[in-house]
Design a protein with these regions (language model features):
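Amphipathic alpha-helical substructures
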Residues: 112-145
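Hydrophobic residues in alpha-helical segments
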Residues: 98, 114-115, 133, 150, ...
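Amphipathic alpha-helical core segments of compact helical bundles
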Residues: 103, 131, 151-155, 194
Length: 203
């Protein structure tokens, strides 16, 4: 379900707020949606601090301009009561989880968590990432695929330091001792993990 897809990524990233109750919050969403819908009379002001990372249950909803990532994952419009949600599987959903500002930030934070909690060696960090996200013993084939992905991305960002700066370091702080290139590569790894069928469909 829409809220659970976001909440799971939020939880795995380590950013999720455990705060309960209180008013609705305004997590990141694509810019200018409200300005276009309301002729510039209203705007979506992204919440700051802990409220930015509260569960989807607390997200402000407006029927005329629903929160886009939830709408993409079949959240009901609230115009009528919904007994059962109809689930779909569309390419647009993958665009959200790969490119939406919030999901990219979740991937960045998950990368930081992998780096700081996973050990000192790359192989240990990748094993930690698999155990954390899939919640089962690490399979050799998955580890090999993830290692190949990491090495390829690391080589890419070593040749393109400006691209590494674009991907990591603006929202989530750089861990002590880490390089931007390494964290950018880990962010791609984290993004891929958050988009696995085992995470989105079976998690």
């Amino acid at each position: 379900e829409a809220e659970m897809v976001r909440d799971q990524a939020l939880s795995l990233s380590g950013l999720q707020s455990v705060k309960m109750h209180g008013p609705s919050v305004y997590p990141p969403q694509p810019p200018n949606l409200w300005q276009a819908a309301f002729n510039g009379q209203r705007s979506w002001v992204t919440s700051k601090g802990e409220d930015r990372y509260r569960r989807g249950f607390y997200t402000f909803l407006r029927r005329t301009v629903p929160y886009p990532s939830m709408a993409t994952f079949d959240a009901p419009s609230r115009e009528i009561c919904t007994v059962r949600r109809i689930r779909t599987n569309t390419p647009l959903q993958s665009f959200v989880t790969l490119n939406d500002e919030a999901y990219v930030e979740f991937a960045q934070a998950l990368a930081r968590r992998i780096y700081t909690e996973g050990g000192n060696l790359t192989v240990d960090r990748l094993k930690f990432a698999l155990r954390l996200t899939l919640a089962k013993p690490v399979e050799a084939r998955r580890l090999a695929a993830l290692t190949e992905l990491f090495n390829g991305e690391l080589a890419y960002y070593q040749e393109r330091p400006d691209a590494a700066k674009e991907l990591f370091g603006k929202t989530v702080p750089l861990p002590p001792g880490a390089s931007l290139r390494e964290m950018a590569a880990l962010t791609v790894v984290a993004n891929v993990l958050l988009n696995l069928d085992a995470i989105l469909m079976k998690g």
